Swiss-Prot record:
The keyword Oxidoreductase applies. The lineage of its organism: Archaea, Methanobacteriati, Methanobacteriota, Methanomada group, Methanococci. It comes from Methanococcus aeolicus (strain ATCC BAA-1280 / DSM 17508 / OCM 812 / Nankai-3). Keywords: Methanogenesis, One-carbon metabolism, Oxidoreductase. This is F420-dependent methylenetetrahydromethanopterin dehydrogenase. GO terms for biological process: methanogenesis, from carbon dioxide; one-carbon metabolic process. Residues 249-277 are annotated as: Disordered.
Amino acid sequence: MVVKIGIIKCGNIGMSPLIDLALDERADRTNIDVISIGSGAKMGPNQVVEVTTKMVEDIKPDFIIYVGPNPAAPGPAKAREILSASDIPSVIIGDAPGIKAKDKMAEEGLGYILIKCDPMIGARRQFLDPVEMAMFNADVIRVLAGTGAARVVQNAIDDIVEAIEAGNEIELPKIVVTDAKSVAAAEFSNPYAKAKAMAAFAMAEQVANIDVKGCFMTKEMEKYIPIVASAHEMIRTAAKLVDEARELEKATDSVSRKPHGADGKRLNKTKLMEKPE
C-alpha cells in the first residue's frame, strides 16, 4: 500500500521546509507519496482557504498535515474549519502561539504538534531582508534537528503512516514539543551533549519572546531594531550549541541515526560504520 500524504504550507516556520523531506530523506520510500501545496509567505484567510480547499476537494490524500505559524490566527483558523469538516484525518503543526488553541483543535477532531523551540522571526523591514531571513531559518532548522524536536515530529507522522498501512484506527497526535520530549527523542549518550541541546532549546524559546517584543510591542525604530537583531544573535548561538552537542556525540561514535528503510520501516544505528537495523 502507498499512503498518500498531503502537506499544506501557509506562511513559514522552521519546520515548514523540513516536514516533507524528513519523511523521505533519501527519496526512496516505496510506501508513501507526498504532495505539498502552499501559499508562500502569506497566511491570510483568502490564501489559506484556497490551498486548503484544493487539498481537500481535489487532491484527497489519506491524511493531511497543515504547517505554519500560529494555528490560532485567522487564516489558520479557516484551514482548521475546512479540515475539521472534511473526513480526512488532519494534523496541525505549528509554533508556541498555537498552544492556546490546542483544546479547540482537539474539539475539532484535529491532531496537533506544537513546537516550542520554533520561534518567530524578527520581521522588521529595517532589519529583515532575504539573506537575514534565510540565515535565521537555517539556524532554526539546526536547532529543530539538533535538539530532537524534528524527530518528535517525524515519529508522530510515521505512526500515522503505519496505522494506515495496517488498517488500524488512526490516533492523531496531540503533542506540545518541549525540551524534555525533544532530548528524549534525540537519544543523547553524552550528558553534556544533552545539556547543550536543552540550553539551545531554551534559547530558541526566548527568541520568540524577544521577537514578539520587537515586532509588536515596541514602536520606536531605534529600540526595536536592536531588539530583533539580538533575537537573531541568540538563535545563531543556539545553533552553535547544537553543533557542539553533535560533535560530542561524534567524538564517541554514538550519534543516534534513525533512517527510513525503502519500505518505510524505521531503522536504528549509532556506530558510524555499522548498518542500520
